[in-house]
């Protein structure tokens, strides 16, 4: 084995298998691009993004860890979100939750 070497099993890996998901349409109403990382609590993203914010409480983007989605000014796109796992306690971000979901 080489340090850092990955030895994956054969076949495809399904991210977030069996976790609840939600599909939302998001529009960037601002004049600057907004980029959202894979583990950011979607409910608390930039206010220039318009969508059903309350429905996204407790969800994040359903994308691979370390990646992001960018919303250009005036752009509207549909994204899939996945429920946060673990203890479902959220601190930081925009400070809108600061505790248990």
From Swiss-Prot:
What NCBIfam families does the record tag this protein with? PRK13203.1 (NF009682), urease_beta (TIGR00192)
For this protein, the Enzyme Commission number is 3.5.1.5
Q: Any keyword Cell wall biogenesis/degradation?
A: no
Q: Which UniProt keywords apply?
A: Cytoplasm, Hydrolase
Instruction: Give the pathway listed in the UniProt entry for this protein.
Output: Nitrogen metabolism; urea degradation; CO(2) and NH(3) from urea (urease route): step 1/1
Q: Does the keyword DNA-binding apply?
A: no
Q: Which family does it belong to?
A: Belongs to the urease beta subunit family.
> Where's it found, cell-wise?
Cytoplasm
A GO biological process this protein is involved in? Answer: urea catabolic process
Q: Which molecular-function annotation in GO is an example for this chain?
A: urease activity
Principal place of residence: cytoplasm
Q: Name a single GO cellular component.
A: urease complex
Q: What is this protein called?
A: Urease subunit beta
Q: Tell me, how does this one assemble?
A: Heterotrimer of UreA (gamma), UreB (beta) and UreC (alpha) subunits. Three heterotrimers associate to form the active enzyme.
Species assigned in the record:
Ralstonia nicotianae (strain ATCC BAA-1114 / GMI1000) (Ralstonia solanacearum)
**Reaction catalysis annotation:** urea + 2 H2O + H(+) = hydrogencarbonate + 2 NH4(+)
